[in-house]
Swiss-Prot record:
PROSITE patterns, alphabetized: RECA_1, RECA_2, RECA_3
InterPro entries assigned: AAA+_ATPase, DNA_recomb/repair_RecA, DNA_recomb/repair_RecA_CS, P-loop_NTPase, RecA-like_C, RecA-like_N, RecA_ATP-bd, RecA_C_sf
Function comment: Can catalyze the hydrolysis of ATP in the presence of single-stranded DNA, the ATP-dependent uptake of single-stranded DNA by duplex DNA, and the ATP-dependent hybridization of homologous single-stranded DNAs. It interacts with LexA causing its activation and leading to its autocatalytic cleavage.
Keyword annotations of the record: ATP-binding, Cytoplasm, DNA damage, DNA recombination, DNA repair, DNA-binding, Nucleotide-binding, SOS response
SMART domains: AAA
GO cellular component: cytosol
Compartmental location: Cytoplasm
Name recorded for this polypeptide: Protein RecA
Gene3D superfamilies linked to this entry: P-loop containing nucleotide triphosphate hydrolases
Family membership noted in the UniProt record: Belongs to the RecA family.
Organism annotation: Rippkaea orientalis (strain PCC 8801 / RF-1) (Cyanothece sp. (strain PCC 8801))
CDD domains from the UniProt entry: RecA
GO BP terms in the entry: DNA recombination; DNA repair; SOS response
Length: 349
């Protein structure tokens, strides 16, 4: 093999070809991987601080994200919180409601500015994905949510008879659309969130029988895949059920370590409990101490029981702000791993 030498003529030729590529295909079409702008991945908050930590900072901009899980596990709630966070920062959000099930009142309760939220309710999967592509190409939208992949019905299936067998139509539709959309997403910096449902594979003896809809293309194109599950129903005495405890596993993450887990409360009619997340992190960082059922702060007992501790923080915003500031200081100084449990899995299922 011939020796590789550092020839000035090669550097000159490289500079010329890079300039030619940028003239032909636009600035940023080719760059060195170590460029500062290339290495930095900006993020937006998911609406849950514990999940932001598990993600390594939040939902990455300019990437495709898939949120999947069983019914009533919090998929849409999580997506709406992400929309609310973008709008609070002055961004533009769009919601492609393929299921035709978006509730304006619930969205408003979660902090979504429904007056400025762009909503599309397409009849076919082709129309929905074309709308997404045009929104992303405009570079004027900061986040697009598609609810859901299972509802992206191909036009041929809608126009056909109910009993017709249409093999692989949706998978081919998703594969073609993602090939087209993926590059534009990276250039625009838009966050594109696909919500997905689970199905059961028949005759599976070993491994999980669960599979997401829409084929395998989304699994490959997504930079982040979040598996959200309901693990507990929250009850309060005679009042009955008032929420659920959700667990999110980061099944795939191309911008931070994967397989981390975050848990948070979702309160019916209110969404993710911000104070619940804060209390969990405050306990893990030793800002708030717990002995038995009692929670204490600065050596003084503040409440008995977790629900009462959350209510105390809600009723005392000044104390909550102080605790949040102390928690954030500790998170910036220390490792994030203490706030995130790790799974035993070493590969994506």
């Amino acid at each position: 093999m011939a020796a590789i030498t550092n020839n000035p003529d090669k550097e000159k030729a490289l500079g010329l070809v890079l300039n030619q590529i940028e003239r032909n295909f636009g600035k940023g079409s080719i760059m060195r991987l170590g460029d500062a702008a290339r290495m930095r991945v900006e993020t937006i908050s998911s609406g849950s601080l514990t999940l932001d930590l598990a993600l390594g900072g939040g939902l990455p901009q300019g990437r495709i994200i898939e949120i999947y899980g069983p019914e009533s596990s919090g998929k849409t709630t999580l997506a709406l919180h992400a929309i609310a966070e973008v709008q609070k920062a002055g961004g533009v959000a769009a919601f492609v409601d393929a299921e035709h099930a978006l509730d304006p009142n619930y969205s408003n309760a979660l902090g979504v500015d429904i007056d400025n939220l762009l909503v599309a309710q397409p009849d076919t999967g082709e129309s929905a994905l074309e709308i997404v592509d045009q929104l992303v190409r405009s570079a004027a939208v900061d986040i697009v949510v598609i609810d859901s992949v299972a509802a992206l019905v191909p036009r041929a299936e809608i126009e056909g008879e109910m009993g017709d067998t249409q093999v692989g139509l949706q998978a081919r539709l998703m594969s073609k659309a993602l090939r087209k959309i993926a590059g534009n997403i990276g250039k625009s910096g838009c966050v594109v969130i696909f919500l997905n449902q689970l199905r059961q594979k028949i005759g599976v003896t070993y491994g999980s029988p669960e599979v997401t809809t829409g084929g395998n293309a989304l699994k490959f194109y997504a930079s982040v895949r979040l598996d959200i599950r309901r693990i507990q129903t929250l009850k309060k005495g005679s009042e009955g059920e008032y929420g659920i405890r959700a667990k999110v596993k980061v099944a795939k993450n191309k911008v931070a370590p994967p397989f981390r887990i975050a848990e948070f409360d979702i309160i019916f009619g209110k969404g993710i409990s911000r104070m619940g997340c804060m209390l969990d992190l405050a306990e893990q960082t030793d800002v708030v101490n717990r002995k038995g059922a009692w929670y204490s702060y600065n050596g003084e007992n503040i409440s008995q029981g977790r629900d009462n501790a959350v209510k105390y923080l809600e009723d005392n915003p000044e104390v909550a702000d102080t605790i949040e500031r102390q928690v954030r200081e500790k998170l910036e100084l220390g490792s994030l791993n203490f706030a995130i449990s790790q799974t035993d899995d070493n590969e994506e299922e």
